[in-house]
Amino acid sequence: CRHFDFMSSMAVDGIVNYGIGDWCAPFDGPAISVNMSTFKAPVALTDTACYYRSARMLSKMSRVLGLDDPYLARSEEIRAALLRNFVDADTGEVAGACQTSDGCVAFHHLLKPQEEARLMERLAERIAQNGWHIDYGILGSKYVLNMLGEYGRTDVIYKMLTREDYPG
């Protein structure tokens, strides 16, 4: 609860823009510690998604323990803020237009099932257009690989992970 309270204290209108972002993605330029502003996936997107996940987990724990559950309503407020700020309502495009951004929104199941399925199609297309190259860091590795697996796209995972050129 303390970490959630801390994230809540850092949130502005439901958005948390405090954290490390998608570290270690392949990039050109200076060292990662001075290159965070060039991350493709907005730090506020990945941070807010983690904030949302924390609210969902606390909600589940509260219900299991038979306690009052203020977290479910809070999670829906966070979800609404995240979608409003990072997902185009008309096109479904996620801010950052990258593997991590798409994977993040899908991993946290922020969209309706049919919208999530379209997002996963777009993610597979994005990866193919990038020559099957990995284009994510530490957070994206969890999001992208898990969601491709969940959607049965092991063919995409295989092509990504067997690249012999960088980054592969």
Predicted features along the sequence, with ranges:
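Active-site core of glycosidic bond-cleaving carbohydrate-active enzymes
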Residues: 1-168
